[in-house]
Amino acid sequence: MRILNASGCLDGLTAPAQSLDSFVTKTVTPLPRAGNPPPRIAEVEGGMLNSIGLQNPGIEVFVTNVLPRLVEVGVPIWVSVGGFSAGDYATLCERLDECDDVVTIELNLSCPNVEEAPETASELVAAARAATAKPLFAKLSPATWDIAETARAVADAGADGLALVNTIRGLALDENLRPRLGSGTGGYSGPALKPIALACVYACANAVDLPIVGMGGVSNGRDALEFAAVGASAVALGTILFSDPSAPDRVRAEIESETLTIGYELTKGKRPDVSNSATFPTVSAK
């Protein structure tokens, strides 16, 4: 089973990135963004909150200065892109289409001020699809209207796969009952998100015939197999990387031991069949 990182959760120039099957960059926007005021990260019950604000150098600096250094790590590169209009996504994908070292583009459809109604998501994916021939994975939020309906919409618009799920909005207060994050609320991630993420993956796997990267609380091999059981072809590690940067190697080893313990079969290149039930005597996953 392939292991990636969730966008923004690992520095691509560090040793742990070399243990991934693919590296996913932080989200890149057309123009540079300074990001949100600090504090930007807070540890909370069941996970963490983050409010980075899409800080990045912009697409031109990324392509010129950042991407060449990431390529040296030696793993396939997925670039996460985000914008505020269909034109933004088209611009980003058109620029990345020129980059041979980019194997896949992740469309972050959960950006601030981008309404993730199915018709809006479809419009954004269609604009990206017209701008590039590279594989496109649509990253969806669990706080969407009907995630299965949104999955069908982005599939019809040309998405090649799904990344499920992004964070869900949360708020934490300090001892003085003030927000612990500089921007107030932030994205909630970690183990507490896993049941929500599993439900979203299961719903989408039954709705569309696309590969799915499952994420949201994956901390060990058992978590990864649970995502495979509900339809994920691969998993991405996020919050766990902040406390255990070596998690990719550990989770990979645990997947192997768990498959022997519970008798699951991971067949490379094949997605699980989830048409009848979320549990199976045999599960196949890419």
Task: Give the ranges of each region predicted by the language model.
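Glycine/Thr-rich beta-alpha phosphate-binding loop at enzyme active sites
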Residues: 48, 109-119, 150-210, 250
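C-terminal helical cap(s) of enzyme catalytic domains, especially alpha/beta-barrels
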Residues: 35-45, 173-186, 228, 240-266
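Glycine-rich phosphate-binding active-site loops on the catalytic face of alpha/beta enzymes
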Residues: 28-30, 107-111, 163-171, 217-218, ...
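Glycine-rich beta-to-alpha transition loops that act as phosphate-gripper elements at the mouths
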Residues: 8-9, 80-84, 140-146, 165, ...
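Catalytic cores of alpha/beta
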Residues: 14-17, 91-96, 144-157, 206-207, ...
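Hydrophobic faces of well-ordered beta-strands that scaffold small-molecule active sites
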Residues: 3-7, 23-25, 77-81, 105-107, ...
